[in-house]
C-alpha cells in the first residue's frame, strides 16, 4: 500500500518546495524505496502551456506530452521515476472534471459543492497519479501542494489532504511544512515569528505538520530551533534547517544529515535499507573541481527571468559535471543585439539559442546565429533556435533574402518555416491544426523516436536514432529543403511518419560544430548521466577555446 507525504509551504512562495520534495524523494529512493511525486497547482488554468514565462517560468514537457509545472523537471532530475500527465494537475482540471460529471448526471441531482465534490475529486486525482507511477506501485508518493498556506486558492487542496490523511489512517500519511526564517539585518538576528504564524494557520485548518523545513540564508542555531519547536508543537529533532547552498545537489545530503528520511520512515512505519548518497557526493565533488572553464552565451528574450530556462540551465550544469568543466552562462538579450550588433559575442566559447515564441527579438537571435556560423563558434539551436538557424542559412548562404517563418511574417513569399498542419502523435493518432486552432494544448508534444542519418555529427552524438520530447507548432518547410541542402545544410534526422526535419547541422568542412534540433533535449538530461548533446556541445566549446588560444600563441 502506498504511503503519502504532503509537502506544504508557508510565509512566501518560491522557497523551494519542489527541490525539497525532490531531495526527500532522492534519499528515500537511495534507501531502496519506490518513490513518485505529484505537484498540485492551485491556479485555474488547465495547464501552464499558455502562461507567460514571466508569470510561470518554464513549462516542463513529460514523455507522454503533458505541459506541466517546472517542478516536475526537478523530480525527474532527482529520481529515476519518469513523470506523466497524471503527476501534475490544477484547480482548472479539477473543476473541469467535476463540471463534466455534473453535466453527465453523475451526481444524481445533488448540489455540487467544494466539500465534498471538489475535495473528493482532488483525492481521486492524487490516488490516480500515484497509481500511474512508472516505477510500479510506489512505496511512497510525495505530494507537493503549490501556493502558500493562507491563500484562498490552496484551501481545497489542503482540505483534501487533511481528509485523505484521516481516511488512510495513522502511519499512512504525514505532513512536511516548508517555511521561511528570515534574517533581519538591522536586528542582526533570525526571526521565528513568521514560521510560528504559518504553522498556526496550518493547524487552524486541521493539519499539524510532522516535520518543519526551515529555509534561511544560514544554518539556524539551536536556540531558534528550540523556540520553533516549542511554539509549533513539533519535536525539536523534526525542526530541520535548510540554508542557502551553491548547488541544489547538496540538498539531499543536508536533509539526510539532519535525519529527515529517518523521521519520515518512522512516521510511516517503513524499515528500508540505509541511505546511500555516494552518487550525490561524487556529483558535487566533480562540480566543484573542474579542469576546464568555458563561457556559453544564451541568447533569448526572457533572460531577465532565468526560471524560463530552468531545465536548459540544469542540462548545461550536468554537462559541466560530466566534462569536468566550469560552464559560465552569459545571458544575452536578443533585442540588444538588434540594436547594438554582435560585437559583445566575441569572447564567447559557444552560442546557444533556446526555444521561444513570438516575433520580438528574433532578428537579434538570427544575428547571433550568423555570428556563430561565420566565426566558426560552436552553435546549438533548440526548437526556435533551429528554425532561426535555417532562416539565417536560407537568407545569407542560399540567397533567399525574404526567408522567414509564418509565425513572424504570415505573408512571406519564402516560407522556410511554417505551421505544421498534420502530424502523428506518440500513440500514432493523426493531429490536425490550422492558424485558427486554440493556443492551449494544440502543439506537437511529447517523446517521439526517429532515425539519424549515418555519417553525421548527430550520429556521432546520439547513435542510430534519437528519442526526445517536443513542444512546437512550426517546422522547417520541406519544400525548401532541396535548396538548403544544395547550399550545404544537412538534415540529419527526420520523423519516420511525416518526414519532418528533426535535426540539422553544417558539415564539418563548413563549421566545426553547428547543430539545430527541433526537440527539447534539456527535458531528458539528468545529473546522473548528463546528456550526450550537451556534453558534446561543451566539449566543442572547450575545443574552440583551445583553438583560439593556439591561434593567438
Swiss-Prot record:
Residues reported to bind UTP: 13, 191-196, 227
Swiss-Prot/TrEMBL keywords: ATP-binding, Glutamine amidotransferase, Ligase, Magnesium, Metal-binding, Nucleotide-binding, Pyrimidine biosynthesis
Region (Amidoligase domain): 1-270
Active site, renumbered: 383 (nucleophile), 520, 522
Function: Catalyzes the ATP-dependent amination of UTP to CTP with either L-glutamine or ammonia as the source of nitrogen. Regulates intracellular CTP levels through interactions with the four ribonucleotide triphosphates.
PANTHER family xref list: CTP SYNTHASE (PTHR11550), CTP SYNTHASE-RELATED (PTHR11550:SF0)
Cited HAMAP family: PyrG
UniProt-recorded name of the protein: CTP synthase
Annotated organism of origin: Burkholderia thailandensis (strain ATCC 700388 / DSM 13276 / CCUG 48851 / CIP 106301 / E264)
Organism classification: Bacteria, Pseudomonadati, Pseudomonadota, Betaproteobacteria, Burkholderiales
Gene name per UniProt: pyrG
Amino acid at each position: 500500500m502506498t504511503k503519502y507525504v504532503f509537502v506544504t509551504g508557508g510565509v512566501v512562495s518560491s522557497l523551494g518546495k519542489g527541490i525539497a520534495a525532490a531531495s526527500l524523494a532522492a534519499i528515500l529512493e537511495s534507501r531502496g524505496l519506490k518513490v513518485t511525486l505529484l505537484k498540485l497547482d492551485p491556479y485555474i488554468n488547465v495547464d501552464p502551456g499558455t502562461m507567460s514565462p514571466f508569470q510561470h517560468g518554464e513549462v516542463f514537457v513529460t514523455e507522454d506530452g503533458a505541459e506541466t509545472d517546472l517542478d516536475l523537471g526537478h523530480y525527474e532530475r532527482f529520481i529515476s521515476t519518469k513523470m506523466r500527465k497524471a503527476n501534475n494537475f490544477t484547480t482548472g482540471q479539477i473543476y473541469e472534471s467535476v463540471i463534466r460529471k455534473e453535466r453527465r448526471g453523475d451526481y444524481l441531482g445533488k448540489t455540487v459543492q467544494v466539500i465534498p465534490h471538489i475535495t473528493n475529486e482532488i483525492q481521486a486525482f492524487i490516488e490516480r497519479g500515484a497509481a500511474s507511477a512508472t516505477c510500479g506501485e510506489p512505496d511512497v508518493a510525495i505530494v507537493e501542494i503549490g501556493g502558500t498556506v493562507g491563500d484562498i486558492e490552496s484551501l481545497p487542496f489542503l482540505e483534501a489532504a487533511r481528509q485523505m490523511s484521516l481516511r488512510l489512517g495513522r502511519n499512512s500519511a504525514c505532513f512536511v511544512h516548508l517555511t521561511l526564517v528570515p534574517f533581519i539585518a538591522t536586528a542582526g538576528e533570525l526571526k521565528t515569528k513568521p514560521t510560528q504564524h504559518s504553522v498556526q494557520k496550518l493547524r487552524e485548518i486541521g493539519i499539524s505538520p510532522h516535520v518543519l523545513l526551515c529555509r534561511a540564508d544560514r544554518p539556524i542555531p539551536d536556540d531558534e530551533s528550540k523556540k520553533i519547536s516549542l511554539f509549533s508543537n513539533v519535536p525539536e529533532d523534526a525542526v530541520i534547517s535548510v540554508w542557502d547552498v551553491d548547488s541544489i545537489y547538496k540538498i539531499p545530503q543536508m536533509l539526510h544529515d539532519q535525519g529527515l528520511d529517518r523521521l519520515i520512515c518512522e512516521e510511516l512505519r517503513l524499515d528500508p535499507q540505509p541511505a546511500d548518497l555516494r552518487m550525490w557526493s561524487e556529483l558535487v565533488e566533480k562540480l566543484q573541481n573542474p579542469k576546464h572553464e568555458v563561457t556559453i552565451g544564451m541568447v533569448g528574450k526572457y533572460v531577465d527571468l532565468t526560471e524560463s530556462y530552468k531545465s536548459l540551465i540544469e542540462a548545461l550544469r550536468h554537462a559541466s559535471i560530466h566534462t569536468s568543466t566550469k560552464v559560465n552562462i552569459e545571458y544575452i538579450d536578443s533585442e540588444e543585439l538588434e540594436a547594438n550588433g554582435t560585437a559583445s559575442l566575441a569572447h564567447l566559447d559557444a552560442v546557444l539559442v533556446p526555444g521561444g515564441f513570438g516575433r520580438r527579438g528574433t532578428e537579434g537571435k538570427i544575428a547571433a546565429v550568423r555570428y556563430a556560423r561565420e566565426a566558426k563558434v560552436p552553435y546549438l539551436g533548440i526548437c526556435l533556435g533551429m528554425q532561426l538557424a535555417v532562416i539565417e542559412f536560407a537568407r545569407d548562404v542560399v540567397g533567399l533574402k525574404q526567408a522567414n517563418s509564418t509565425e513572424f511574417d504570415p505573408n512571406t513569399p519564402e516560407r522556410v518555416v511554417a505551421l505544421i498542419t498534420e502530424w502523428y502523435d506518440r500513440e500514432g493518432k493523426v493531429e490536425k491544426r490550422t492558424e485558427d486552432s486554440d493556443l492551449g494544448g494544440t502543439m506537437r508534444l511529447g517523446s517521439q523516436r526517429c532515425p539519424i542519418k549515418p555519417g553525421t555529427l548527430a550520429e556521432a552524438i546520439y547513435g542510430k536514432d534519437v528519442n526526445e520530447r517536443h513542444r512546437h507548432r512550426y517546422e522547417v518547410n520541406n519544400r525548401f529543403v532541396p535548396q538548403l541542402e544544395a547550399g550545404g545544410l544537412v538534415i540529419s534526422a527526420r520523423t519516420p511518419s511525416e518526414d519532418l526535419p528533426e535535426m540539422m547541422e553544417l558539415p564539418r568542412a563548413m563549421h566545426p560544430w553547428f547543430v539545430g534540433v527541433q526537440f527539447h533535449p534539456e527535458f531528458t538530461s539528468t545529473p546522473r548521466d548528463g546528456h550526450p548533446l550537451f556534453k558534446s556541445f561543451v566539449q566543442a566549446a572547450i575545443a574552440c577555446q583551445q583553438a583560439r588560444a593556439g591561434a593567438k600563441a
